[in-house]
């Protein structure tokens, strides 16, 4: 997404969000600003945090995911989960203020795409603020472990160019005060700790007695429909796709939307549902914060300014579909 770019200042907050309430109301929908805390599939009702209960004939869930933070880490004075995205904007302001006082030690935990982009864009933030910081990426087993060696090599070169220290084979085990301890026993200074260790759906579905996958996501069939409750559907990060595991990337959520729309309408009238067929190849572009990106498209891997220009164009074009 565009979150790391907002952290660095490449994108403004208003450029990476759209007004869901306005969109819903303008199309004749009701908008309720509240949190669903439990689903009652027997009564076909949603229980909201504010106490209200909302009945449904069909329901679609896109409740997203969050970053699980161990209690031994959450005690740190300045831990920043990379989701929800508002956390990044708050961290940006706090880092800019802190840089006026001293050189910072910033640690990013997580060697996936999010960790890579956060670490790289932190360097841009520090540079533009005319400050100084030691930035360390603790990548777990290895950086971008599930990717081709060509992608990893370009990412590693990019981090070296940005003077980001990469540590592999270790994880952040504990954090307190102004330091973190790694699984190797090593302790490192840390003023800000960004947690990018993967995402996990909320416990909503398990708490409601609805079948869920190993990570707690709503277990759905190829129609994006609950395997036990045919009136319940879902998409994005909050589902577990029974036919095969799906990476938690935005392209799947975007492609699931028209399928969900069709199937919700068809379910209301007893029509035949249409399957979601996930693509196996999709464009991946990692924003390196310096106007370049590492790009993978099928077997093609490249990096540079053209890569970032492509990513930026696609991201902004998508957002403008809903902002206009």
Task: Please name every model-derived segment.
Residues 92-132, 138:
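Rossmann-like NAD(P)H-binding beta-loop-alpha module
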Residues 1-58, 148-165:
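N-terminal Rossmann-like dinucleotide/flavin-binding domain of flavoprotein oxidoreductases
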Residues 31-39, 124-222:
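A Rossmann-like FAD-binding core segment of flavoenzymes
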Residues 77-102, 187-255, 262-263:
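FAD-site-proximal beta/loop scaffold in flavoenzymes
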Residues 26-107, 194:
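FAD-binding core/adjacent interface of flavoenzyme oxidoreductases
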Residues 290-324:
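C-terminal auxiliary extensions adjacent to catalytic cores
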Residues 127, 251-279:
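Internal hydrophobic alpha-helix adjacent to the cofactor/substrate pocket in enzyme cavities
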């Amino acid at each position: 997404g565009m979150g790391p770019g907002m952290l660095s200042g490449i994108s403004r907050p208003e450029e990476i969000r759209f007004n869901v309430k306005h969109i819903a109301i303008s199309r004749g929908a009701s908008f309720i600003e509240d949190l669903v805390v439990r689903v009652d599939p027997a009564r076909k009702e949603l229980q909201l945090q504010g106490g209200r209960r909302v009945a449904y004939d069909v329901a679609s869930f896109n409740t997203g995911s969050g970053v699980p933070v161990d209690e031994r880490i959450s005690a740190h004075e300045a831990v920043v989960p990379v989701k929800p995205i508002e956390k990044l904007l708050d961290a940006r302001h706090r880092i800019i203020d802190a840089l006026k006082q001293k050189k910072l030690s910033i640690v990013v935990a997580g060697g996936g795409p999010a960790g890579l982009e956060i670490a790289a864009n932190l360097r841009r933030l520090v540079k533009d603020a005319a400050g100084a910081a030691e930035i360390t990426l603790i990548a777990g087993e290895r950086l971008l472990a599930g990717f081709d060696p060509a992608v990893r090599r370009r990412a590693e070169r990019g981090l070296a160019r940005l003077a980001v220290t990469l540590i592999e084979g270790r994880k952040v085990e504990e954090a307190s005060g102004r330091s973190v301890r790694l699984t190797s026993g090593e302790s490192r200074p840390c003023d800000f700790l960004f947690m990018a260790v993967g995402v996990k759906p909320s416990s909503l579905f398990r708490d409601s007695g609805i079948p869920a996958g190993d990570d707690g996501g709503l277990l759905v069939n190829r129609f994006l429909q609950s395997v036990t409750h045919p009136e319940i559907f879902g998409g994005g990060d909050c589902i577990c796709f029974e036919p095969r595991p799906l990476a938690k990337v935005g392209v799947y959520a975007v492609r699931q939307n028209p399928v969900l729309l069709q199937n919700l309408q068809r379910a209301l009238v007893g029509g035949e549902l249409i399957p979601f067929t996930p693509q196996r190849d999709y464009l991946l572009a990692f924003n390196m914060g310096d106007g370049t990106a590492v790009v993978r498209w099928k077997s093609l891997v490249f990096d540079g300014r053209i890569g970032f220009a492509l990513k930026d164009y696609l991201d902004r074009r998508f957002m403008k579909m809903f902002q206009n």
